């Protein structure tokens, strides 16, 4: 284990602290709800869903937070403005912790930022995300909102190297005119969470992991990623699981994906990650104990470097 020379920022969003030196604060874990084809969703366009089932999933993740000490975040995904607004209104009613406003649609993200501001729960929200694709209209909505936290994506499609990721943060790299950190600051973002933008194996996955160390060493900001996308996009694993299913080994095929999924998250934790977007919130019961174990190992090793874990750290609660 190691200690960064640069002072490490610790941000507090809706009562959860994220950041610090490795071994100091537990890894924050964000589970996604209302994702594509989520079985609790009845109408993806209108945002109609099983409220009892959704609340149960959020409560189960909160229970794992209480058990392990790892801060829980709810990553709310919606494909349309109507759906995402419906979802975040509901989550704000049943959950007082941080939630991410997430969509592949800029219109939906803008609607969510406006709604969170109007309804008075913007301080609970994390925008996802400030990146090289953000246009002037979406950026202006973010500027005018009350949001103070955002994922800042260090991804340059023209340069997937570690240097490229650092450049896109500082000067826009080969794609944007301004650095993402400058955009975040001018938008009133006080709490930037740097996402190293993990891409598939063979296309920059390793650089994204290495960038985690570089970002913390250079800037001291909290860092993390949605690294579970690696096994999801792994062609070999997809084909291997298909072969198992065809051979009648359906449970084994499912188990192998779960192992790789959770294992990928642990790579981000070991790479000095402060937060992990771990995928479906349904997997909280598997992800939290595994990450808590790795957090405890890191904290124990960091003690020799003079780093003391906080009282709610898994090392203090579970060891």
From Swiss-Prot:
Listed EC numbers: 7.2.1.4
Keyword Methyltransferase: yes
InterPro entries according to UniProt: Dihydropteroate_synth-like_sf, MeTrfase_MtrH/MtxH, MtrH
Keywords annotated in UniProt: Methanogenesis, Methyltransferase, One-carbon metabolism, Transferase, Translocase
GO aspect biological process, one term: methanogenesis, from carbon dioxide
Catalysed reactions, as listed in the record: 5-methyl-5,6,7,8-tetrahydromethanopterin + coenzyme M + 2 Na(+)(in) = 5,6,7,8-tetrahydromethanopterin + methyl-coenzyme M + 2 Na(+)(out)
Assembly and interaction partners: The complex is composed of 8 subunits; MtrA, MtrB, MtrC, MtrD, MtrE, MtrF, MtrG and MtrH.
NCBIfam families: mtrH
Protein name as annotated: Tetrahydromethanopterin S-methyltransferase subunit H
Taxonomic lineage: Archaea, Methanobacteriati, Methanobacteriota, Methanomada group, Methanococci
Annotated gene: mtrH
């Amino acid at each position: 284990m190691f200690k960064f020379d640069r002072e490490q920022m610790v941000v507090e969003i809706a009562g959860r602290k994220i950041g610090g030196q490795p071994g100091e604060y537990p890894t924050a874990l964000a589970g996604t709800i209302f994702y594509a084809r989520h079985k609790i969703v009845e109408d993806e366009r209108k945002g109609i869903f099983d409220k009892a089932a959704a609340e149960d999933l959020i409560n189960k993740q909160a229970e794992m937070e209480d058990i392990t000490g790892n801060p829980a975040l709810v990553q709310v995904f919606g494909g349309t403005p109507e759906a995402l607004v419906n979802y975040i209104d509901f989550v704000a009613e049943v959950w007082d912790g941080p939630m991410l406003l997430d969509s592949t649609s800029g219109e939906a993200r803008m609607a969510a930022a406006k709604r969170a501001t109007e309804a008075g729960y913007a301080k609970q929200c994390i925008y996802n995300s400030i990146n090289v694709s953000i246009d002037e209209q979406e950026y202006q909505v973010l500027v005018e909102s009350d949001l103070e936290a955002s994922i800042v994506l260090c991804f340059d499609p023209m340069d997937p190297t570690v240097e490229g990721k650092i450049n896109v943060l500082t000067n826009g790299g080969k794609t944007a005119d301004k650095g993402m950190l400058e955009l975040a600051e001018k938008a009133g973002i006080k709490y930037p969470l740097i996402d190293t933008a993990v891409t598939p194996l063979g296309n920059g996955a390793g650089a994204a992991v290495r960038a985690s160390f570089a970002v913390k060493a250079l800037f001291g900001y909290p860092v993390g990623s949605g690294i579970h996308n690696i096994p999801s996009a792994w062609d070999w694993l997809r084909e291997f699981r298909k072969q198992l299913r065809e051979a009648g080994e359906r449970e084994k095929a499912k188990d192998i994906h779960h192992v790789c999924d959770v294992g990928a998250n642990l790579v981000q934790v070991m790479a000095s990650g402060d937060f992990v977007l771990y995928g479906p919130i349904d997997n909280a019961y598997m992800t939290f104990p595994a990450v808590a174990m790795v957090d405890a190992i890191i904290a124990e090793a960091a003690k020799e470097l003079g780093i003391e874990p906080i009282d709610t750290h898994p090392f203090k609660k579970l060891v």
